[in-house]
């Protein structure tokens, strides 16, 4: 009797590539004519998975976010992996913007994905684990159909499919 096939649905970010994009962004800020004397800074806290942008004005912070976004895209990081807060007033008339790197699938999103897969009426079993989902079925074709379906959906964060067996 054939064993069930399965795969995991995860949301992970390669922090080394994020760090590389961050380094490229700081280099561009220090060299770009319109940004180098503005006093704008960007910091990355790897432990908290947090970007902190300090800028003299809101439009400068948006320019830095655009630079960082272009560097992240070139490094293969989906922009949905970074959740930006609204700009906040900081000391000295500056603006601070925080960007959180989103990893793992939270329970609400996992339940929504589970419901969407169940609504497809495929013979698959979905198990919600801590920060990922395991989808299993006797039919590999059903698993491929689920992968194609999930790629077409938008859950506000990037999804990867790993551990395909």
Residue ranges and their predicted role:
Residues 2-3, 7, 96-165:
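Positively charged, low-complexity, intrinsically disordered RNA-binding extensions
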Residues 60-98:
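Helix-adjacent hinge/juxtasegments
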